[in-house]
Amino acid sequence: MTEVVAREVYYCGVCSFPPEYCEFGVSLKRCKDWLQDNNQELFDKIYSDDALATQTSTLSIERQEKISQELAKKQLKEEAKQERELQKKLASKVLIKRIERNRRKHIISISGLEVFNIDMKKLAKTFASKFATGASVTKTADKKEEILVQGDVSDEAKEYIEKLLEEQGLNGVEVEQVDEKKKKKATAPGATPAA
């Protein structure tokens, strides 16, 4: 019996399609640039003048122009959308609150991560195993998710979140630490505070 060899498929680093199908996506220009930088041989095979001429020889000139105009319009829309999303991400900030529970016990609350398409449950699980503490995802009063981590690990959490955002190419995002102390109960006039 003969051995069946799996076919090697090369995928685009921008749209994750095979390069032959990048033209059906909305980021063709970026896909072409990426392919030219990473695999010149395949780029020449797909986008050389001869290859383009054979592909378009069956289409009428009007149809070709219409297709290229529609494609250019879609690409511009997609680029504008991606630019808006990037600006929104860079303008937002992550807030790490250190909240005092008892005298020496603290929890930290991490909010503002939902903008960055980060799986909150997975991140909470990572924090729980990385810091050997309890961590959970809860909803705030304004229906946004936050991660609650037991223990005073705000500095370590800040470093980890900054590294995580840097991996996504978001170096300009502000990660702010806030110390929130529990309000002490007011004592009645004339009463002595408990020690």
From Swiss-Prot:
InterPro entries: DENR/SUI1_TIF, DENR_C, DENR_eukaryotes, DENR_N, SUI1, SUI1_dom_sf. It is found in: Cytoplasm. One of its GO terms (cellular component) is ribosome. GO terms for molecular function: mRNA binding; translation initiation factor activity. SUPFAM superfamilies: eIF1-like (SSF55159). Residues 176-195 are annotated as: Disordered. Residues 94-165 form the SUI1 domain. Keywords: Cytoplasm, Ribonucleoprotein, Ribosomal protein. Interacts with the 40S ribosomal subunit. This is Translation machinery-associated protein 22. The lineage of its organism: Eukaryota, Fungi, Dikarya, Ascomycota, Saccharomycotina.
